[in-house]
Design a protein with these regions (language model features):
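Cap/insert and terminal regions of metallo-dependent hydrolase folds
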Residues: 179-206
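Binuclear metal-dependent hydrolase catalytic cores
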Residues: 1-173, 189
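DG-centered beta-turn motif at the end of beta-strands
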Residues: 175-177
Length: 206
């Protein structure tokens, strides 16, 4: 399992020189599995460059892509409008929030709203790729390709999900926008236990 960071910022992208070390794009992570298959976590502005890189690679395994969303606040979905693979009719893209408490139709309506003509010139139903909105109502899921997914809700206004992704003996945990409050969120602790890699933001730390 290989992890590539395409966006590490929150709230808004930042172009200023002092942010060059970690980049200026909002949340977007690429996971490349041992089979060569990929998954994307969050669709912030970093997904624009990620899409360009995937097009340049032109690999058939990129025709079916899962984009797992922690939540749908703007900085986690704003790049999807500029994700070039979404305009390619050869692609099948699954947009997903795994975990209990959010309906698939709600997820689709969020994207449809952001692409209304008041905000964007291309409507969701006119986008080129085949889109699937997927929200299994479970906290644990085994993908047919043998990837284990555990989703856990954590403290954030409007709710957000962390993901524990396991391939073979390697485990990645992705928890962003976590607001621990006076005590550490016990859900995050349980989700992260014995992980090989924890991706956790530091925006809300003292």
């Amino acid at each position: 399992m290989k992890v590539t960071f395409y966006g590490t910022r929150g709230s808004i992208p930042v172009p200023d020189r002092e942010f060059v070390q970690f980049g200026g794009n909002t949340s977007c992570i690429l996971i490349t599995f041992s089979t060569g298959r990929i998954a994307i976590l969050d669709a912030g502005t970093g997904i624009r460059k990620l899409g360009n890189d995937l097009l340049a690679a032109s690999h058939e395994q990129y025709d079916n892509i899962i984009v797992g969303l922690s939540h749908t606040h703007w900085d986690h979905i704003q790049g999807f409008l500029f994700f070039k693979l979404a305009n390619d009719p050869r692609r099948h893209i699954t947009l997903a929030i795994c975990g209990k408490g959010r309906a698939t139709k709600d997820l689709e309506s969020v994207f449809a709203t952001t692409m209304q003509d008041d905000y964007f010139p291309v409507a969701l139903d006119k986008i080129g790729a085949k889109l699937t909105f997927w929200q299994p109502d479970t906290s644990e899921y085994i993908h047919p390709r043998g990837i284990g997914i555990v989703a856990s809700k954590h403290n954030h206004p409007g709710g957000a999900y962390g993901y524990r992704i396991t391939e073979g003996d390697k485990t990645l945990v992705y928890c962003t926008d976590v607001e621990h409050g006076d005590e550490i969120d016990s859900n995050v602790v349980a989700l992260s236990k014995d992980a090989d890699l924890l991706i956790h933001d530091a925006q809300y730390t003292p």
